[in-house]
């Protein structure tokens, strides 16, 4: 583990200055004057100073009792664990991996493969699972290479300890919140197919993988599929309980705990302690079904079959992938045609940690094919001494008493559980139907073009595009959230980048102003990107405003609410505005990912996961049936329009006298499309 500095607590006045700067672009002059008076009032400063001193004392005690900690850590856990609504679409994000180019998905492949129509699925799942086991081995042996920023600055590695064997457990009787349970001795995985559960051991007592090659694992996965298919559709899909609110799920678990037959409770404990869950989906998605694949990876699909000859209502009517999940844990999802992704419970880990996992297992799964051809292939999971990450087979002495043949988990149901399963299924079906997802794959240019031609930070640039698209559609600016990683500090998590600035507003308005010159638009774009990059740097250094103020609020709420009146800043409308993230965005770029996404965090908002590659930009947009497709289309139009502005400016520089009619007409058509939202919505465009 690297020896890192503690996450700093900024000076209070610096935090307040940043807060005022971040909220100002979202207010009119009257609102901002009121907020400034509130924030700078003696009443507010006295209260916050008291809480700030208590926070410094709390952090000092924490540093002494647990050096590997941070002041925000427990408060951040509580923010997740106190959340009572379903984790589906509200907490869990997903990553979709790129396809495996060494596994061909064709009808001929399926027909000739050893596992029939499931050949591609079984091989992909076996490769990725084997690679994950190597990853776990390195974590437990302490040989996982330290994460760094550009190969230099080391990052905190504490989150990897909670990545596997962890489960979000609903509150027990009398408990105020969920808790994160981690079994550091877990050696088994759970696999699901058609909502049915199986388990088997995958690590020996030395934490060495039992299945050293994918081929050794394939038959286990195929036998699970065959057994589940032979069982028909009568099994109880207990995974749907993890889609319930925490209170409902808690009541069901309590009922199972007190049942005379302890079979169901034993099953729960076995799933809770599993390393992770392998979800083998009985569905394939074609290339033109990317939006539906996104839905399946993030929340599962809802497919209702009302044919009475095939199913007996009310159970077993739902045949979508939403029943083939266990949302309280890390899940590896593999479709029938080999599309693969990861859905993860967010409490203990952030996207950067899971991205490292995704990168390593994707790379290793590809290399495993090459190693079958030649042994002269690098092993990314080799130890520092070059020793391979696992022996060819786990020794018998350390594999004794391990269960390597899949065993099915059988559930006992009664009238209460049958009705609970039914209503859980109808609720998740309702929830899924309320959301829509749109994928934008922009291939005209990417990070390389943005840096060399536009001279902008790619992330800062794309953030401006989101604001342009939203303003073009709705004529206003809303709160935008982007997480900045603070893992350069011990047990760091994230800080909130607030993307709307005075500079970004000027750029957005200029881009939509047909009277503004291209030179002006370019300069304002550079100003906006520079401001965004500066905020990003400060946040990455732990010098933001959101986490500090949130810690102060938590201190007041937990220990001082009976002694101290709530500080005025937390009663001001600006605080509500800043917490209402209409555009919740996150950048998780890596070549191993096909897409990345999550649900909106407000009822009227958008969730925007994006990947900036060298020559393309991929965006997944989610919302509760706002104009999602139109919003994504405006992003694309904005990207194209900005590129045309630079091309026109370059042409003028090369030929100052050239003024072609074609370029003028192109500009007019682009702006007509971007401005179409103003004619459709009766809103002010002066915000």
Swiss-Prot record:
Compartment(s): Mitochondrion inner membrane
Residues given in the record as (R)-carnitine binding sites: 481, 494
A Gene Ontology cellular-component term: mitochondrion
Taxonomic superkingdom: Eukaryota
Coiled coil: none
Record: residues binding CoA: 446-459
Induction comment: By ethanol and by acetate. Repressed by glucose, and to a lesser extent, by galactose. Derepressed by glycerol.
Pfam name, any one: Carn_acyltransf
This enzyme's EC code(s): 2.3.1.7
Phosphoserine: residues carrying this PTM: 517
Membrane association type: Peripheral membrane protein
GO molecular function: carnitine O-acetyltransferase activity; carnitine O-palmitoyltransferase activity
Keywords: Acyltransferase, Fatty acid metabolism, Lipid metabolism, Membrane, Mitochondrion, Mitochondrion inner membrane, Phosphoprotein, Transferase, Transport
Gene Ontology biological process: carnitine metabolic process; fatty acid metabolic process
InterPro entries: Carn_acyl_trans (IPR000542), CAT-like_dom_sf (IPR023213), Cho/carn_acyl_trans (IPR039551), Cho/carn_acyl_trans_2 (IPR042231)
Active site: 346
Swiss-Prot/TrEMBL catalytic activity: (R)-carnitine + acetyl-CoA = O-acetyl-(R)-carnitine + CoA
Record has Kinase as a keyword: no
The keyword Repeat appears for this protein: no
Function statement: Involved in the transfer of acetyl-CoA into mitochondria. May also be involved in the metabolism of acetate and of ethanol.
Family of the protein in this entry: Belongs to the carnitine/choline acetyltransferase family.
The name this protein goes by in its record: Putative mitochondrial carnitine O-acetyltransferase
Gene of this entry: YAT1
């Amino acid at each position: 583990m690297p020896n890192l500095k503690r996450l700093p607590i900024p000076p209070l006045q610096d935090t307040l200055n940043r807060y005022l700067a971040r909220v100002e672009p979202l207010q009119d002059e009257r609102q901002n004057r009121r907020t400034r008076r509130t924030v700078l009032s003696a009443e507010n400063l006295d209260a916050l100073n008291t809480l700030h001193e208590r926070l410094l004392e709390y952090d000092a005690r924490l540093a002494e009792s647990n050096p590997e900690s941070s002041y925000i850590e427990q408060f951040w856990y509580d923010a997740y664990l106190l959340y009572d609504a379903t984790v589906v679409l509200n907490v869990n994000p997903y990553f979709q991996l790129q396809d495996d180019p060494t596994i061909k998905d064709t009808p001929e492949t399926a027909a000739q493969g050893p596992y029939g129509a499931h050949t591609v699925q079984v091989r992909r799942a076996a490769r990725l699972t084997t690679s994950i086991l190597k990853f776990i081995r390195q974590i437990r042996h302490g040989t996982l290479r330290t994460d760094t920023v550009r190969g230099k600055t080391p990052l905190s590695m504490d989150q990897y300890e909670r990545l596997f064997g962890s489960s979000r457990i609903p509150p027990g009787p009398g408990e105020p919140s969920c808790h994160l349970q981690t079994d550091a001795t877990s050696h088994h995985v759970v696999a699901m197919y058609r909502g049915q559960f199986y388990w088997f051991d995958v690590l020996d007592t030395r934490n060495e993988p039992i299945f050293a090659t994918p081929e050794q694992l394939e038959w286990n996965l195929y036998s699970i599929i065959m057994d589940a298919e032979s069982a028909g559709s009568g099994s109880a899909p207990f995974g749907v309980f993890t889609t319930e609110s925490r209170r409902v799920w808690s009541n069901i678990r309590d009922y199972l705990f007190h049942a005379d037959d302890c079979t169901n409770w034993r099953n729960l404990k076995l799933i809770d302690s599993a390393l992770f869950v392998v979800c083998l989906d009985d569905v394939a998605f074609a290339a033109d079904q990317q939006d539906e694949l996104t839905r399946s990876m993030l929340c599962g699909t809802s497919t209702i079959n009302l044919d009475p000859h095939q199913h007996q209502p009310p159970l077993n009517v739902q045949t979508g992938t939403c029943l083939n999940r266990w949302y309280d844990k890390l899940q590896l999802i593999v479709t029938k045609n080999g599309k693969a992704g990861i859905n993860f419970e967010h409490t203990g880990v952030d996207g950067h940690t899971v991205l490292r996992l995704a990168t390593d297992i994707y790379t290793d799964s590809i290399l495993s094919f090459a190693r079958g051809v030649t042994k002269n292939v690098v092993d990314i999971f080799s130890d520092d001494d070059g020793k391979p990450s696992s022996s060819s087979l786990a020794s018998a002495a350390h594999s004794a008493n391990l269960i390597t043949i899949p065993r099915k988990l059988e559930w006992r149901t009664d009238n209460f559980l049958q009705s609970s399963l039914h209503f859980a299924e109808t609720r998740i079906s309702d929830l899924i139907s309320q959301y829509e997802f749109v994928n934008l794959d922009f291939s005209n240019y990417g990070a390389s073009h943005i840096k060399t031609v536009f001279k902008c930070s790619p992330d800062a640039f794309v953030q401006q595009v989101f604001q342009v698209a939203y303003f073009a559609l709705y004529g206003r600016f809303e709160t935008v959230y982007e997480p900045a990683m603070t893992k350069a500090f011990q047990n760091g998590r994230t800080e909130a980048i607030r993307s709307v600035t005075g500079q970004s507003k000027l750029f957005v308005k200029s881009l939509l102003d047909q009277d503004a010159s291209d030179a002006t638009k370019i300069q304002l774009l550079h100003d906006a990107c520079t401001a965004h990059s500066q905020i990003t740097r400060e946040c990455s250094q732990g010098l933001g405003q959101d986490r500090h103020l949130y810690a102060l609020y938590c201190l007041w709420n937990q220990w001082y609410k009976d002694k101290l009146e709530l500080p005025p800043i937390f009663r001001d409308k600006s605080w509500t505005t800043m917490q209402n993230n209409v555009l919740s965005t996150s950048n998780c770029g890596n070549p191993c990912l096909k897409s990345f996404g999550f649900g909106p965090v407000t009822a009227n908002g958008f969730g925007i996961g994006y990947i900036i590659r060298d020559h393309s930009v991929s965006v997944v947009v989610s919302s509760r049936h706002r104009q999602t497709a139109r919003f994504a289309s405006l992003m694309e139009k904005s990207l194209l329009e900005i590129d045309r502005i630079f091309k026109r400016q370059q042409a003028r520089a090369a030929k100052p006298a050239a003024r072609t009619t074609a370029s003028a007409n192109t500009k007019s058509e682009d702006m007509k499309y971007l401005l179409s939202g103003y004619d459709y919505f009766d809103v002010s465009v002066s915000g």
